[in-house]
Each structure stands twice: as structure tokens, then as C-alpha cells.
Amino acid sequence: MSDYILEIKDLHASVNDVPILKGVNLSIKPGEIHAIMGPNGSGKSTLSKVIAGHPAYSLLNGDILFYGRSILKMEPDERARAGIFLAFQYPVEIPGVSNADFLRIALNARRKFRELPELSPLEFFQLITEKINLVGMKESFLSRNVNEGFSGGEKKRNEILQMALLESNLSILDETDSGLDIDALKIIAQGINTLATSTNSIVLITHYQRLLDYIIPNFVHIMSDGKIVKTGNVNLAQDLEKHGYDWIKST
């Protein structure tokens, strides 16, 4: 098995025939937290969706390896069952589907892939009760429809709850800090830090350095015009906060 959870090699991708990713290279080992920053239109969110297998994006060149195996031919649901989790910038509402049913079905699909027995409703309730406390949610959220009527912070916490429950190997969090006040941000960050282990990896996609005040990444990558143009530690994010993205172009 590969030493890397994720390897992205010379990745080029487009949407509606417009090139967005123009040669992305990235390697992530177990236990690492990577932050990807960049201005609007730099390709950050596109990269996350291409990894997850979003059908709107066309792969032009390159490869994506998950534990050393290409996932390009895997459907999005196969990638999710294999252990790739994507938290959306704007989580969708699913009317008519309760949080509890959605989470139990998703968890059992993941367990089936891992050749583990499905959980009964009682076993699931015992597990979800443990996980729900992690993100400061009330049990009443389980009976509500998925994200329907949720505030922005509640939607983001619901995604972290999914991440906790599914125990994904690679979690990609696309602008999880977007629209959160400082109290909600701290709760989300605490949950993410608790879920970071020596065997999984987390990718944080963000515009702002403030998230990295609470979650310290091993690596910070700056994207510009569809490529990773600079890599460093958390100090790079702090420099970016001081000088802006034009500073990257001049270095």
C-alpha cells in the first residue's frame, strides 16, 4: 500500500469547456492536515469537486490516486464509500428525508464497503448520540429533515457530524468557515481537531487565515490560476493575511 492517502499528479480539469485546473500536484500522508488557500477563481473548490468525482467537471489530464490506486473510473458514491468525504461550502437541503435516516443509510453503506455488519436502529442511535455531542448539536436535529430550515452554522455542524460518523480516511472541507460567527467557528474547529487522527487526513479549503488560528495545518498551499504556486507552513497563511494575494504573485 502507498505511503500516501492522496496523490494528485499533473491534474488538468475543465467545466463547460473552460480550463480550471492547469497542472495540480499534491501528496497527502496519513495524519496530515493540509490547508488550500487562494483568491476566487483560483481552482480551490473545483479541485475538491474533481477529487469527489463531481460529474460536471471533465478531466483533461493527470491522475488522482487514493492509497496508490487511481480513482478516476470510480463513481462519486463509490469514492464516498471508499472513504473520501466532501463537506460542501453550501450544504444542500433534502426535504422529506430525516437526518437520522440519511445518516444511518450513509453509515451502513460505508460499513458494507468496509465489510462490517450494518447497524440496527438501536445500535445506530447509541452511536449517533455519542457523535452528536462532539459538534454541540441537540438530538432533536436528528428528527428534522436534512439541513431544512437550518442556520448556516447548523448546516456546517451537520456536515462535521457526518464526517465524525462516517470515519472517512480523507475529509475535504470546502470553506467550512464561510458565514460562521466566532463562536460557531470555534465549535466547528474543536470538532475537526477531535476527528484528526494519525490514520486519516484533512484538507481545509479556505479564503481566510482565521480558521487556521484554531486548526493548525501541517502544510499550507496557495492556489492561483489553477495551480499550486506556493507551499509552506502556517506562517505562509499569516503572511498572506498581512500582504494579500498580490504578494504571492510578486514573490
Curated annotation (Swiss-Prot):
CDD domains recorded: ABC_FeS_Assembly
Any one Gene Ontology molecular-function term assigned to this protein's record: ATP binding
InterPro entries with a match to the protein in the record: AAA+_ATPase, ABC_transporter-like_ATP-bd, ABC_transporter-like_CS, FeS-cluster_ATPase_SufC, P-loop_NTPase
UniProt keyword Nucleotide-binding present: yes
Residue numbers binding ATP: 38-45
Matches recorded under SMART domains: AAA
GO cellular component term, pick one: chloroplast
Keywords, ordered alphabetically: ATP-binding, Chloroplast, Nucleotide-binding, Plastid, Transport
UniProt signal peptide: none
Subcellular location, record wording: Plastid, Chloroplast
Pfam family, one: ABC_tran
Domain ABC transporter residues, every copy: 6-250
UniProt keyword Chloroplast, yes or no: yes
Chief place where the protein resides: plastid
PANTHER family listed in its UniProt record: ABC TRANSPORTER I FAMILY MEMBER 6, CHLOROPLASTIC
Family (UniProt): Belongs to the ABC transporter superfamily. Ycf16 family.
NCBIfam families, per database record: sufC
Protein name, UniProt field: Probable ATP-dependent transporter ycf16
Organism: Porphyra purpurea
